[in-house]
């Protein structure tokens, strides 16, 4: 493990892949860099409890309240990062996918919400901005419907003419989502919120990711996180979702990953990094501000 000396004491950049490069002046302070490239392939997309605990034993001491990491293929690490929290809190996720799949693979980017709900301090997980097919029928049958029905998991997908959503989902539209968001935040019983941002919640114009893009614009995230800061305490958070070339440690990860991932759109490396860096320069400062 190699650690740089730069960055705020409250932030860290966990380098698991090649999603980010900071070779030019930026409008924010780059977090302390922690090299974890050797661990990346074994953790990517799906992994085991053994690998999770090994990773936590090696890197847990460098976790900070706010963590920048790479592809959304690593989003399940959020369920690990929140172990730092010491008080009851709500997780608010901006994501184009519900990440709620109940299945035999215990640790995966598509099911991390269930691991987070196992944490006794997590009062609720709310996922805003799901636009892919997983909330539609029959794919939603793979989701954690019991948690949705109990209210412990709140999923707000974008409305679609193709989908007739059940009453345990909370559909939104571009015209009304801010009103719904305000109402939801004002209903939360605790003031402590952990915010996790997957850049795939953004439209194609605002992010290049390994997954399908959503409908939010950067201005939407700017508004939402600033609103949160007025109404609640952001006690921690993370940001992932930037595209990176896939590297897996096992054939099973490779086969499953290739079957599950969408076809990547053609974008030059230079344009990809430029688009994602612009997103980071907007979201990271407002997420991590004191």
What is each residue range found by the language model?
Residues 91-103, 112:
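Long, hydrophobic, well-ordered secondary-structure blocks that form the structural core
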